[in-house]
């Protein structure tokens, strides 16, 4: 009830029903990757762009209280008032390993080892910065629901695709899909099994794709190299220089560090 999703009687607040559905759907994806998380030590999860932290609190309750994991979750957001309120609620509930910090994703250096990185509607290139951090930390799992993929909309330079680029809504949707496709291929390049899945029905949010990446230690070099070549060729064809490429693809080796 403190988060404004449920009433005192345990009913979902009507105006928050879409958010309630999104959080529950995200927890289903978390449940799917539980075999990738260790149970013999503390598990660290980063929630970048946590906002009011509906998902962050739900994950902590689900993993610690219901599944019995020794869990540490860190929520990061730029909004000082939001972080202050979330920190207050964590203390109120006795969640001593649920911590919140104010700051940007690209500048956050508060941990050295992370098991899972999640983002739910981290806007535009914030998803790329979160992905880069996850790779640098060696996260076993990445779950990301991107939004507001505007970057490539300003970059596309392939004149032969005018049947798409001449129409704003088609151009916008194509560039959003291209952004997430490049991200997925970069994760494959770094040794992850990667899927792009439908997050939730469009009626609840138009931002309905989830990138799920699970690291595999025995990923073949050939597969990684193929993914890297596909990224290069695709970006060259359309004149793209996305943050995911400049920040990750060009600065990390093909083998995950």
Q: What is the predicted function of each stretch?
A:
Residues 248-254:
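Conserved small/polar residues in nucleotide/adenosyl-binding loops
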Residues 1-40:
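Conserved Class I S-adenosyl-L-methionine-dependent methyltransferase catalytic core
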Residues 84-112:
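S-adenosyl-L-methionine
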Residues 101-168, 196-201:
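S-adenosylmethionine
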């Amino acid at each position: 009830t403190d988060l404004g999703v449920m009433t005192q009687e345990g009913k979902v607040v009507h105006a928050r029903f879409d958010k309630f559905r999104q959080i529950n759907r995200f927890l289903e994806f978390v449940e799917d990757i539980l075999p990738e998380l260790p149970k013999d030590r503390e598990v660290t999860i980063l929630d970048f762009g946590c906002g009011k932290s509906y998902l962050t609190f739900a994950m902590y309750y689900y993993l610690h209280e219901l599944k019995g994991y020794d869990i540490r979750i860190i929520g990061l957001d730029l909004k000082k008032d939001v972080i202050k309120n979330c920190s207050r609620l964590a203390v109120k509930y006795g969640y001593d390993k649920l911590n919140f910090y104010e700051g940007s994703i690209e500048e956050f250096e508060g941990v050295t080892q992370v098991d899972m990185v999640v983002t739910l509607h981290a806007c535009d290139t914030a998803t790329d910065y979160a992905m880069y951090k996850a790779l640098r930390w060696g996260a076993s799992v990445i779950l990301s629901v991107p939004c507001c993929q505007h970057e490539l909309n300003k970059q596309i330079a392939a004149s032969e695709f005018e049947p798409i680029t001449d129409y704003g809504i088609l151009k916008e949707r194509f560039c959003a899909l291209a952004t997430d496709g490049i991200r997925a291929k970069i994760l494959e390049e770094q040794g992850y099994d990667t899927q792009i899945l439908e997050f939730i029905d469009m009626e609840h949010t138009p931002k309905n794709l989830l990138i799920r990446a699970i690291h595999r230690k025995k990923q073949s070099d050939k597969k990684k190299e193929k993914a890297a070549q596909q990224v290069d060729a695709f970006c060259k064809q359309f004149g793209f220089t996305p943050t995911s490429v400049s920040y990750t693809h060009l600065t990390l080796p093909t083998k995950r560090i």
